Amino acid sequence: RRAVSLWREDAHRWADTAGAEGAVVERLAVRVRGPLSLLAGLWLPGGERVLGDHGARRDVAESYLEGLQDALPRLRRATGAGRLGVVVDEPWAAAVLAGTLPTASGYRTVRSLPREEARGLWRAALDGLTALPDVARVWLAPGRRAASPGAELPGPAALATLTGESLPRPDAAADAPVPAPVSLVVGVGALDDGADGTPGTREAWEAAAGWADIGRGLTLAPEPGVRPVDVVRTWERLGVDPGRVG
């Protein structure tokens, strides 16, 4: 209840400030924690992570979707935004899938979440969000935050591929690719001529290029220090139209 109260206070303060400034909000982007990372960050009364309990995972996932479907329309009304864009942020996605998150004792790790269950959680969240008339676009942003130094996580390309399998497929009957309401966010590093960059960089670029080639929604997220011009040059070198990426 306290969290809901604070959230509503923030929304009203934002609306009051925009009203005082005479600002007209045509588009508003909202970042929400994704279902996998939410499960990783919640704890049961006994002290263990919700992630390790199948029944608790199911209950939280249902409440999560209900909460978003209630909160987002409220936010749009409070702010007067013409359209909402929602970023589903999954910083712990790779750690959840790799089973590297520690238990409460710290001596063991929570078992990895089955891939099919992860895909199901993402599909349910994305389907619920895109069904809302208040939401114009959704981005799914999987991350590779490690719970401990040296933890082995799925590579950027593998994570992008797994996440992408959860996204809605474009209409195969369409004459031309139409921007999907859901886009996959792929992190990319520097890729100079004749060099592969950091480990996994080339694979991430190739996964992104393949995604764009089949007309799927895609947004590139350059790593710190990577200039936008480098992203465009690499994209062109891979033979993909820069207009296909956000």
What are these regions (language model features)?
Residues 63, 67-203:
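Active-site loop segments of alpha/beta catalytic cores
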Residues 8-18, 65, 69-76, 119-126, ...:
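Generic structural signal for well-ordered alpha-helices
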Residues 26-28, 82-85, 136, 243-245:
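Residue-level recognition of the N-termini of beta-strands and the immediately preceding loop/turn
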Residues 1-70, 74, 97-113, 117:
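Active-site-proximal, glycine-rich beta->alpha crossover segments in alpha/beta enzymes
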Residues 167-169, 175-246:
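Catalytic-face loop-and-helix region of soluble metabolic enzyme cores
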Residues 16, 20-23, 77-81, 127, ...:
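Secondary-structure boundary motif
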Residues 32, 88-90, 222:
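Short glycine-centered, acidic/aromatic-flanked micro-motifs in structured strand/loop junctions
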